[in-house]
Amino acid sequence: MKKIIICFIFVFSINISFADATSDLIDKIKNIHSMTANFNQKLIDGQTNNNLNSKGNMSLKKPQYFKWITTSPNNQEIVSNGTKLWIYDGDLDQLIIKKVSNDIAQFPYLILLSKNTNNINKLFTVTAQDNNSYILKPKNDQMIDSIKIKFTPNNQLEYLEISTSLNQFTKIEFNNVKTDVDISNTSFDFTAPQDTDIIDETKSA
């Protein structure tokens, strides 16, 4: 009986720690109302041993606005106004327009727009490595193995690490981070340059 009680206490304490970690993470994310930053991204492909480095800038504004601009080595823009998602490839002069997806596997940035603890709990098991680092393990997603979110001591986003089931690892480091900045909603709309090949998937049945 004593062993059963000890086991119950142990399991209960683990559940509390998971809940506390999720709550702490949500509190940090909630405090990011808007944000701009530069980023350096490294993609390591474990299958081919190829590395791909890129850099650019990003901005987000809650509850639904997001922009991710890669300036090197290729010109690519990913912009969302909460309804539509524009994916523009400047090298190919091609624009793909999609409906906004809630698929974390495709768009891990959606975590940064989260404001509902229940949604995080539904999708992930969250553990805290320390006061500023969190590991998110998807409960159902088959593509992502884990996401690590690291904050600075003053609660600014420092980096994201994403490991996938395809043996790929991505680390995105943020610098020149500014939070609670005034960003116009219209900056999250996208107008294609002239002569762009446009594929509008929102019009498909």
Curated annotation (Swiss-Prot):
Record-linked InterPro entries: LolA/LolB/LppX, OM_lipoprot_carrier_LolA-like, OM_lipoprot_carrier_LolA_Pbac
Keyword Lipoprotein: no
Pfam families, per database record: LolA (PF03548)
Signal peptide extent: 1-19
Any Gene Ontology biological process: lipoprotein transport
Subcellular location: Periplasm
Family affiliation: Belongs to the LolA family.
Function field: Participates in the translocation of lipoproteins from the inner membrane to the outer membrane. Only forms a complex with a lipoprotein if the residue after the N-terminal Cys is not an aspartate (The Asp acts as a targeting signal to indicate that the lipoprotein should stay in the inner membrane).
Assembly and oligomerization: Monomer.
Name of this protein: Outer-membrane lipoprotein carrier protein
Gene: lolA
